[in-house]
């Protein structure tokens, strides 16, 4: 909403749409590891992420032409296992999907992030692919910086 209010002659945007997406599965299964696993293989990228001790999120890179309805959960687990190293593959526990979706990947940045008293933050300012859930971290960081500026200014004037 704020970005649409920015003066068009001052706002510059940069976007990159990637030629692949991530087929993601959220499942009530213990994680492969307590650490993030990024696997870059000839078959494509894979990501293993722990949500809790009993819930995990996994991704495999797929062409943008793939449709989630063309994937079964068994096909997903097989493909994920094929992209993991032997140790991670041995720790992979499979199960039904709570959620299964394909996320198209893109990066986006708007500049400047300030227009007078209006500041762009979060997705209004920048979007990153969902590696390790950094998007929400960036939004929180933006707000953290925005919060400290007026507080610092007020303390300097006191």
Cite the ranges covered by each PLM segment:
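Conserved FAD-binding catalytic core of PHBH/FMO-like flavoproteins
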Residues: 1-105, 110
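Conserved mid-domain beta->alpha element of the FAD-binding
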Residues: 2, 101-157
């Amino acid at each position: 909403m704020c970005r649409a209010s920015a003066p068009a002659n001052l706002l510059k945007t940069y976007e990159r749409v990637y030629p692949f997406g991530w087929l993601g599965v959220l499942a009530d299964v213990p994680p492969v590891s307590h650490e993030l696993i990024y696997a870059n293989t000839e078959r494509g990228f894979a990501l293993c992420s722990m949500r809790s001790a009993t819930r995990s999120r996994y991704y495999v890179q797929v062409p943008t032409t793939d449709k989630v309805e063309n994937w079964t959960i068994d096909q997903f687990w097989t493909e994920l296992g094929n992209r993991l190293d032997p140790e991670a593959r041995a720790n992979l526990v499979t199960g039904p999907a709570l959620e299964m979706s394909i996320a198209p990947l893109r990066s986006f940045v708007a500049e400047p992030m300030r227009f007078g008293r209006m500041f762009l933050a979060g997705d209004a300012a920048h979007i990153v692919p969902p590696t390790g859930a950094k998007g929400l971290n960036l939004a929180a960081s933006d707000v953290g910086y925005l919060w400290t500026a007026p507080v610092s200014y007020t303390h300097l004037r006191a």
